Swiss-Prot record:
Presence of the UniProt keyword Cytoplasm in the record: yes
Gene name of the record: dapAL
Coiled-coil regions listed: none
Keywords (A to Z) from UniProt: Cytoplasm, Lyase, Schiff base
InterPro entries tied to this protein: Aldolase_TIM, DapA-like
Protein name as catalogued: Uncharacterized DapA-like lyase PAE2915
Originating species: Pyrobaculum aerophilum (strain ATCC 51768 / DSM 7523 / JCM 9630 / CIP 104966 / NBRC 100827 / IM2)
Disulfide bond annotation, renumbered to this chain: none
Assembly and binders: Homotetramer.
EC number: 4.-.-.-
One GO cellular component term noted in the UniProt record for this chain: cytoplasm
Active site: S44 (charge relay system), Y107 (charge relay system), Y133 (proton donor), K162 (schiff-base intermediate with substrate)
Length: 301
């Protein structure tokens, strides 16, 4: 499997009593109809760590149904140990997902040997396509490129690596050392176009939840060699990404990252996102007004 293009890390609409599955169905349908290459509902953006195992499975069953073979379906583990990672991966395999993204261990910062041992234990038991992942915002560390290199060299089911570090030097190392063997996928909207220009194969991104086809157009422009046009689109979106909090992950709005994406999706599509799962805070009135202003300037609402 060669992963290329734009896979959308979808936001998760909630009702008071659980996941709003009809709202999720509508959002997934819009993304698939827009022509995106894949959907990824059990993502960090989708608040995967706050979903029960049963909710994760049902969400992925719905995604598989809506995608209907038109888009890849990727599932995230959202777990921090090898036992629960293997368990949820097997459940996802039964659903029929196309690939799983493995969240690295979190809470404790691990050394190279411990990380390698984690991947080995998981990959010895999981035989469907796997995307490796680094997200220091959640784990407190960046998985060393050399660990990914060792794991990918040993396990043929590893097909890609998603980088949500925001560290572009690290990202270039991934492209240089792994890009001929694996799909290197950018995880931050702000860095998508620069990554493509430097040889990344695509991205797993949250912006397409509310940007229509803009992110897809960026990808296609770079593929067609129309770099200046892609950069122009990138620059047009910079006020949005700066407001969202520096790559949508860190900065002045830090912990509001998922909820800002959810609010933007609600404003653009009219899908009720419901409350965030605690302890995520709701967006306050000041930030809501600023977000509405930016979306209006972009012609999205």
């Amino acid at each position: 499997m060669k992963l290329e293009g734009v896979i959308v890390a979808t936001v998760m609409p909630f009702a008071k009593d659980g996941v709003n599955y009809e709202g999720l169905r509508l959002l997934l349908s819009k993304i698939v109809e827009a022509g995106y290459h894949g959907v990824f509902p059990t993502s960090s953006t989708g608040e995967v760590t706050k979903l029960s195992a049963e909710e994760r499975v049902r969400v992925m069953q719905l995604a598989k149904e809506v995608a209907g073979g038109k888009a890849l379906v990727v599932a995230g583990t959202g777990t921090g140990d090898h036992v629960s990672t293997i368990d949820i991966a097997r459940k996802y395999k039964d659903v029929g997902v196309d690939a799983i993204l493995i969240t690295p261990p979190y809470y404790i910062q691990y050394d190279w040997a411990a990380l390698y041992a984690f991947y080995k234990k998981v990959l010895d038991k999981v035989d469907i396509p796997v995307i490796l992942y680094t997200i220091p915002l959640a784990t407190g560390y960046n998985v060393p490129v050399e660990v990914f290199e060792m794991v990918a060299g040993e396990y043929s089911q590893v097909v890609g690596v998603k980088d949500s570090s925001g560290d572009f030097r690290y990202h270039l190392d991934l492209i240089h050392l792994l890009g001929k063997r694996l799909s290197v996928l950018q995880g931050l909207d702000m860095l998508f176009v620069p990554s493509l220009v430097m040889g990344a194969h695509g991205g797993i991104l949250a912006g397409p939840n509310f940007l229509g086809r803009i992110t897809l157009e960026q990808y296609l422009l770079v593929k067609e060699g129309k770099i200046a046009e892609a950069v122009a689109l990138h620059n047009k979106l910079m006020p949005l990404w700066r407001f969202m909090g520096g790559c949508g992950l860190v900065g002045k709005l830090g912990g509001k990252w998922p909820t800002l994406y959810k609010l933007a999706t609600q404003l653009v599509h009219g899908i009720d996102m419901g409350p965030p799962r605690e302890p995520l805070p709701p967006v306050d009135d000041k930030d809501r007004r600023e977000l509405e202003k930016i979306l209006k300037e972009l012609g999205l609402i």
